[in-house]
């Protein structure tokens, strides 16, 4: 992403690790474009993200994630016109278009997200997690890291990470905080 932003001469890139650092950067540069992988950042839910958007009204947001729930996307896009969405699976040209549009103050929604949003909402049945997924979710709720869970289960980190992704997908959530409400 740094390379893609470097294509825009007026863009200066900085990276932050957590909410506190993001707040400091937004205080000093309120006209920023924030590229955010919501699923990996320490923002708890859509409401908290929207508070950031309300607080920093000149900031534009580009959500750049692997997997976002459709309910989350609908809520964010309906609540604030300064959010754009592009998925990590998108083509390089689509990611470039998202960056260019967001930098120029336009909203960009990638093709895959648009397709997801056009699918009518369906009343879902009770989510069925496998026994393994339920056990892993309990360990997550206890605050264990993916590595700790893998060690406990005598599994690889990648196996547990795949279970985590499946849990998030089945529950229709984007992060640990939302998943543990289940």
Regions found by a protein language model. Give the residues of each.
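N-terminal regulatory/sensing modules of transcriptional regulators
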Residues: 1-116
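Regulatory hinge/linker segments at domain boundaries
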Residues: 114-139
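Conserved catalytic core of two-component sensor histidine kinases
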Residues: 89, 96, 130, 137, ...
């Amino acid at each position: 992403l740094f390379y893609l932003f470097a294509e825009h001469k007026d863009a200066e890139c900085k990276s932050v690790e957590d909410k506190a650092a993001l707040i400091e950067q937004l205080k000093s540069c309120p006209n920023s474009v924030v590229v955010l992988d919501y699923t990996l950042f320490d923002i708890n839910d859509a409401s908290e993200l929207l508070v950031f958007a309300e607080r920093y009204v000149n900031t534009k947001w580009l959500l750049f994630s692997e997997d976002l729930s459709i309910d989350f996307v609908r809520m964010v896009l309906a609540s604030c016109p300064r959010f754009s969405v592009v998925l990590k699976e998108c083509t390089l040209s689509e990611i470039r278009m998202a960056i260019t549009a967001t930098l120029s103050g336009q909203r960009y929604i990638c093709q895959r997200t648009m397709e997801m949003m056009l699918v009518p909402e369906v009343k879902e049945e009770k989510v069925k997690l496998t026994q393994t997924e339920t056990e892993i979710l309990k360990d997550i709720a206890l605050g264990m890291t993916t590595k700790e869970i893998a060690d406990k289960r005598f599994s690889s980190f990648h196996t547990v990470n795949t279970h985590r992704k499946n849990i998030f997908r089945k529950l229709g959530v984007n992060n640990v905080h939302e998943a543990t409400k289940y």
